[in-house]
């Protein structure tokens, strides 16, 4: 899984093409020199002295520019193309100078995929307090020179491949240890994003409500009119169902007899004599009262 990362690290100059670790030592306040060999094809290239890289690139302390020497504080470097080696000198040693260093050749990217380097372990031991002042002075001015035999590029590449496997394991451990932190940061970012979205939504709703209130305040009369209650009487018209026309009902007929008012009665004393029958026969017969009929219909 991490093989592409290991290959990428092999392409970075100054990383992971190491020879076997060499150890040099010097007293506190003294100095020491380290002689680092290189191949013939690296004669014109720049050489450097650096701390091992923490991530990708190593932290170069001092580097040559051509054949001229270079100094950076208490550390100096000088190239000797005739001897196919360069020398690094550390002066006025302190306990903080102890540790692992690399002396390497800065190869161009297109010529080589890795820098051939030699790992050097520097140890600093305290100066003996039982020495005489003359001995202490001699210790301070003493110089320890360590020369390493040349190491071929093939050996460097093989050792670098072995070391890259260990670097790969260390990288996996670092990533695994930092994975919970990355997941926590991702969860925090998601929570912040959700919170920002909710806040923006609430502000948008408030803005819409504020716009509605401003429109009502601009038209107070219209707002008052709209707020009043209006009542109206609604009369519902009942429309008959569209059914077949009902047959007309029979007309009820009522009959009544209307008689003219009778004349008032008159009483008289009548004396019948022999001529009565004749008079009665001669007297005209009274007509019967007329009867009027009318038809009253109930609608």
From Swiss-Prot:
Expressed not only by natural killer (NK) cells but also by T-cell subsets, B-cells, dendritic cells, mast cells, granulocytes and monocytes. Upon tyrosine-phosphorylation, interacts with PTN6/SHP-1 and PTPN11/SHP-2 and INPP5D. The gene is CD300A. Residues 202-299 are cytoplasmic. The keyword Transmembrane applies. This is CMRF35-like molecule 8. Disulfide bonds join 36-103. Residues 19-123 form the Ig-like V-type domain. GO terms for molecular function: phosphatidylethanolamine binding; phosphatidylserine binding; signaling receptor activity; transmembrane signaling receptor activity. Inhibitory receptor which may contribute to the down-regulation of cytolytic activity in natural killer (NK) cells, and to the down-regulation of mast cell degranulation. Negatively regulates the Toll-like receptor (TLR) signaling mediated by MYD88 but not TRIF through activation of PTPN6. Glycans are attached at residues 83, 92. It is found in: Cell membrane. GO terms for cellular component: extracellular exosome; ficolin-1-rich granule membrane; membrane; plasma membrane; tertiary granule membrane. Residues 1-17 form the signal peptide. The modification Phosphotyrosine is found at residue 293. Keywords: Cell adhesion, Cell membrane, Disulfide bond, Glycoprotein, Immunity, Immunoglobulin domain, Membrane, Phosphoprotein, Receptor, Signal, Transmembrane, Transmembrane helix. Coiled coil: none annotated. GO terms for biological process: cell adhesion; immune system process; intracellular signal transduction; negative regulation of B cell proliferation; negative regulation of B cell receptor signaling pathway; negative regulation of eosinophil activation; negative regulation of eosinophil migration; negative regulation of fibroblast proliferation. It is a single-pass type I membrane protein.
């Amino acid at each position: 899984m991490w093989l592409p990362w290991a290959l990428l690290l092999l392409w970075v100059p100054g990383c992971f093409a190491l020879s076997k670790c060499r150890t040099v030592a010097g007293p506190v306040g003294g100095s020491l020199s380290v002689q680092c060999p290189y191949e013939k094809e690296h004669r014109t290239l720049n050489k450097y002295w650096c701390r091992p890289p923490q991530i990708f690139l190593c932290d170069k302390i001092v580097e040559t520019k051509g054949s001229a020497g270079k100094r950076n504080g208490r550390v100096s470097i000088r190239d000797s193309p005739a001897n196919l080696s360069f020398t690094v000198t550390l002066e006025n040693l302190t306990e903080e100078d102890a540790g692992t260093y690399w002396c390497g050749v800065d190869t161009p990217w297109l010529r080589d995929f890795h820098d051939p380097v030699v790992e050097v372990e520097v140890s600093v031991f305290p100066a003996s307090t039982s020495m005489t002042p003359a001995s202490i002075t001699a210790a301070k001015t003493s110089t320890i020179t360590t020369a390493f035999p040349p190491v071929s590029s093939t050996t460097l590449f093989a050792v670098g491949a072995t070391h890259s496997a260990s670097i790969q394991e260390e990288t996996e451990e670092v990533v695994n240890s930092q994975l919970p932190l990355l997941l926590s940061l991702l969860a925090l970012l998601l929570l912040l994003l959700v919170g920002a979205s909710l806040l923006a939504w609430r502000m948008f709703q408030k803005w819409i409500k504020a716009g509605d209130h401003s429109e009502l305040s601009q038209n107070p009369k219209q707002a008052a009119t709209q707020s009043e209650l209006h009542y109206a009487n609604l009369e519902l018209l009942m429309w008959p169902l569209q059914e077949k026309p009902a047959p007309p009902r029979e007309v009820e007929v009522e009959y009544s007899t209307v008689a003219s008012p009778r004349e008032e009665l008159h009483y008289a004393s009548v004396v019948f004599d022999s001529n009565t029958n004749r008079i009665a026969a001669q007297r005209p017969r009274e007509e019967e009262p007329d009867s009027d009929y009318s038809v009253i219909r109930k609608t």
